[in-house]
A protein has these predicted regions:
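Alpha-helical transmembrane segments and membrane-interface helix-loop junctions
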Residues: 1-82, 86-211, 488
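Alpha-helical transmembrane segments of multi-pass membrane transport proteins
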Residues: 146-153, 162, 185-628
Length: 628
């Protein structure tokens, strides 16, 4: 009885939060779109638009914190070899965004091949998650009390923003409690809460040890919590707090302030809009129109179905900006067709996963937006560099598909009339490329404005396609959930980055790299090996936030252009989506198709080789330019 009641309350809380997130995202879109329209058509402005957007981002993150604390896809589970098992709710893998924030989860898996007992890992991970929630509640609460004054444009108390985050932390603990009661694991929750309260209390009571480099302890603790399956934002917050006991100069309220500052930057407003574009494209059927158009162009050639998957991926990349979006969409759209025409399931799934890499390379790209915010680089230049890199990677994949085309069927040649008809139906998607890439490159609109216009454009197209209101609402809710996940990851990494900067780790890394000399070939080769290794374990968002500030100075000191290296960094980390043990793109396809991930990893090798070849060409050109 108690479990059933908790299950019902948990579902109601989840749906209420998703609805609140959808409404917040709708208000955010209306605010930014109205500001752009007034500026260009009425030669006026919307006073406080940027400030309002910043407040709405904090609201989204606060709403998403309870969902992030219970989400199974927002963590890395190396011991299972695939995403952490869920409680068996409806199976619906996330379709947008590099970070899955979907606690509907995947099927439960057997307990074989675990290297440490599941219960111990669960309790440890849960305790760390609760420590992070307590830190958010306490630190944000103190910041809310300390902050004075009001917002200059909105007239709201400045203490309201940290108060919202503190409330999100309270709801997160409630969500975790309901989940454990629903699963009949109340004792486990009490154990985790006791450990968390003890750690939080002890950290404030024990005199600091004053280590010479607290950031080293910080990195070790963060890596341990990440590998234990702790949700990524919590895996940054809790170690940063614990490191205070080792001399880190950052109290709770300072951590809360840094987190708020990190997740409320106006540039990040583009992220929910690009995620919404991908969701609306799928809901409206425009993504399916892209498939038909791609099939009409290349489906009749050697390995025609494979080339259709690739061309659709390239076209969809220019609209969604999300590799998870393409992997989920491709699994549903292409897997049945490829297997029905004789392609082995593991090869079909590997192809879909490999093509999905392009979505975070070809603009718009969520990864480049995160990198621009983390490293203070030009968003427009990064997107332009990603466009060139994406086309090069697509060319190498096309060659790999052609060489392996004996097992991939082709479709009948489309007539000229059919090609024109499919092209006309796909025109709405091509308009997005003009708005985003051309608008930013020409300097007509900022990245955030381009993203808002693209989302508004896609919303109008969805209405014109007579998309059901329920599907549009679901697209807003899904995008809001995933936006919250990304914002929380970026915000939680801000205290982490501050502590690393205070310790001068970037300078230490640069000095350690001094033995390579100023030879750009050696530097870029060493950095490639490092980033490929990082991509084996970390999600791209976390990897960018942690390693961009460390590796970028090394590359610049060797004479490598920072934009060029930024593109290489993202390409390296995206290739990690195909490599074990994590391989998030392979995991997504495996969960959607039911193909064992071990078979998918093995079948991905030809495409992995093709992408590594493209990386070598990009790296060689960067080193060559720096050399001369």
């Amino acid at each position: 009885m108690l479990a059933s009641m908790a299950q019902a309350l948990s579902l109601r809380l989840e749906r209420t939060l998703e609805l609140a997130g959808a409404l917040t995202l709708a208000v955010l879109l209306a605010t930014v779109t109205a500001s752009v329209a007034l500026r260009y058509f009425a030669a006026s402005g919307f006073t406080g638009a940027e400030e309002a957007a910043s407040w709405l981002l904090v609201t989204l993150a606060s709403i998403g914190l309870p969902l992030a604390s219970t989400a199974k896809g927002l963590r890395i589970d190396l011991f299972e070899g695939r995403p952490a098992p869920s409680d068996g709710r409806d199976q619906r893998p996330s379709a947008r965004g590099e970070l899955i924030i979907d606690n509907r989860g995947t099927k439960p898996f057997s307990s074989e091949n675990r290297f440490v007992p599941q219960d111990l890992r669960t309790i440890f991970s849960g305790a760390i998650t609760l420590v992070a929630c307590i830190v958010v509640i306490s630190g944000s609460g103190k910041a809310a009390l300390d902050l004075g004054g009001v917002s200059p444009s909105l007239g709201l108390s400045e203490g309201l923003r940290p108060a919202m985050l503190s409330a999100g932390g309270v709801l997160a603990i409630v969500a975790i409690l309901l989940r454990h009661v629903a699963d009949g694991r109340l004792v486990a929750f009490v154990s985790m809460l006791a450990i968390a309260v003890g750690l939080h209390s002890a950290d404030g009571a024990v005199p600091p040890m004053d280590l010479e480099s607290p950031s080293f302890m910080l990195c070790c603790l963060a890596l341990l919590t990440i590998l234990a399956g702790t949700p990524l934002p919590h895996a940054f917050i809790a170690p940063a707090y614990v490191t205070v006991a080792f001399g880190a100069p950052m109290p709770e309220e300072a951590m809360a302030a840094a987190t708020l500052s990190g997740l409320s930057r106006y540039l990040l407003t583009a992220i929910p809009f690009f995620l919404l574009v991908g969701a609306l494209l799928t809901a409206s059927g425009i993504a399916s129109d892209l498939v038909c158009f791609a099939a009409a162009l290349v489906g009749h050639r050697r390995a025609g179905l494979g080339q259709t998957v690739l061309l659709t991926g390239v076209l969809f990349s220019g609209a969604s900006g999300s590799s998870i979006a393409n992997a989920a969409f491709g699994s549903a759209a292409f897997m049945p067709q490829l297997t029905a025409h004789g392609t082995p399931p593991e090869r079909a799934g590997a192809l879909i996963a490999a093509v999905s890499v392009l979505d975070n390379i070809i603009p718009p790209s969520i990864a480049f937006l995160i990198l621009a915010a983390a490293a203070d680089l030009s968003t427009g230049k990064l997107l332009a560099g990603g466009f060139v890199a994406g086309l090069l990677m697509a060319a190498t994949l096309a060659i790999a598909i052609h060489v392996n085309g004996a097992t991939t069927a082709r479709t009948a040649r489309a007539s000229a009339g059919e090609s024109r008809r499919f092209g006309v139906r796909a025109l709405p998607a091509f308009g997005l490329g003009i708005i985003v890439v051309a608008g930013i490159r020409a300097g007509v609109v900022s990245p955030t404005e381009a993203a808002a216009l693209a989302a508004a454009y896609t919303l109008v197209a969805a209405f014109l396609k007579r998309t059901a209101g329920q599907e549009i609402g679901a697209a807003f809710g899904q995008s809001a959930r995933e936006t919250a996940a990304i914002l929380l990851l970026i915000g939680s990494a801000a205290p982490f980055a501050f502590l690393i900067a205070v310790d001068g780790v970037a300078a230490q890394v640069s000095s350690l790299a001094g033995w390579l000399g100023s030879n750009p070939f050696l530097v870029i080769a060493a950095l490639n090996l490092l980033l490929l290794g990082v991509g084996l374990f970390l999600d791209i968002g976390a990897a960018i936030l942690l390693f961009a500030p460390l590796t970028l100075p090394v590359a610049v000191s060797a004479g490598i252009d920072p934009i060029h290296f930024g593109v290489i960094l993202v390409v390296n980390l995206m290739i990690g989506g195909l490599t074990p043990p994590v391989g998030i793109l392979v995991q997504t396809v495996g969960n959607a198709s039911g193909v064992p991930v071990v078979a998918l990893f093995a079948a991905s090798r030809p495409y992995l080789l093709a992408l590594l070849s493209a990386l070598a060409l990009l790296s060689f050109s960067a080193a060559l330019v720096a050399f001369f």
